[in-house]
Amino acid sequence: MAFCLGFIMNVRAAAASALYQVVDLGHSLSNALPAAQQQIRPRDHALLQEICYGVLRQLPRLESISQALMGKPLKGKQRVFHFLILVGLYQLSFMRIPAHAAVGETVEGAQDLKGPRLRGLINAVLRNYQRDQEGLDAQATSHDAGRYGHPGWLLKLLKESYPEQWQQIVEANNSKAPMWLRVNHQHHTRAEYQALLEQAGIVTTPHAQAEDALCLETPCDVHQLPGFAEGWVSVQDAAAQLALTYLAPQAGELILDCCAAPGGKTAHILERTPESQVVAIDCDETRLKRVRENLQRLELTAQVICGDARYPQQWWQGEQFDRILLDAPCSATGVIRRHPDIKWLRRADDIAALAELQREILDAMWQQLKPGGSLVYATCSITPQENRLQVKAFLERTPDARLVGSDPAQPGRQILPGEEAMDGFYYAVLSKQH
């Protein structure tokens, strides 16, 4: 739904509009949320995000409660009001907002969504929930989808893939993600920057393996971070920062960052090895704009190319690379805590299609690697089909490929969501024999 510029919208209405776009129209939350933020006061941005993330984390439970209270769901042009009801239910169930304010503000949201006649219905639904909250909550969490907040196909996949750990994964997926920083080694050591943060009253914890990573005790606005505008620090999860550890770039090498957007790993390579030549490719010109913006803020230089990794003949300049970082397109099932819309935008059959795309890119990139060079295969997924099984199949069909640093029976390192406070990620290091 679109609204005129200059109109200050009720936060609950803006949240309902964004949720409608994500769940019903299939838009990503990363697109829907900024559009909704433009309709509200800046001071309400955090509340909007909390509501949208929360509803998406608890969607099956809230849908179940709504169905029990209403019988027939709202349809057609009234669908956005269905999401307004979910917004109200989420506040009453999970937020510390006083009940009268949560109900009153949500009911008023109907006015901004051009549905004043539905205020009575929304008020009645929310009041009825308050009267029997315990019973309705128990009913809504009596089935797995409502209890765990995940679609059936994903729960099944997690249970099959991780029979001992699936509940911890689900819990991590439904939790708030911590804020990790990557200290720019060109300006400060991690210890030096941690001291600067401490002087600013910001408490952090270093990561044991990711050498430049600091975890904030309490997330904050990036503009509160010392030297952010000057490029002293960036926001990047510790798991993503491990790409540098596994890639181990050396000065003077020609390095390819494949599927590079939004450019965090490209920047990290250059921060640590400014003497290296880095080529960053991605097939999405819009997302490459982010790469260029990040490099500009950090005062780093890379060759940024828009190209399809499956068809290097269209963009490759003829010289093989010493190292390749292939952060492959994936299901993103390792970063659900940061992008809860993934649970509802992904479908079970996406996994096989993505695995086939990854296979094509991996085979194409292998031809661009020098003999003696190494390729790091990475995803922010936790599905075996995209990770361990993908690498196993690659090794079986590629005679000059060798796995580095892990057991061929269980190739690579699978990081699960929440492990050492990190996102879910996968890494495998492959060397090319002479």
UniProtKB/Swiss-Prot annotation:
Keywords: Cytoplasm, Methyltransferase, Ribosome biogenesis, RNA-binding, rRNA processing, S-adenosyl-L-methionine, Transferase. It is found in: Cytoplasm. Its EC number is 2.1.1.176. One of its GO terms (cellular component) is cytosol. GO terms for biological process: regulation of DNA-templated transcription; rRNA base methylation. The active site is at C380. It comes from the Bacteria. Belongs to the class I-like SAM-binding methyltransferase superfamily. RsmB/NOP family. This is Ribosomal RNA small subunit methyltransferase B. It comes from Vibrio cholerae serotype O1 (strain ATCC 39315 / El Tor Inaba N16961).
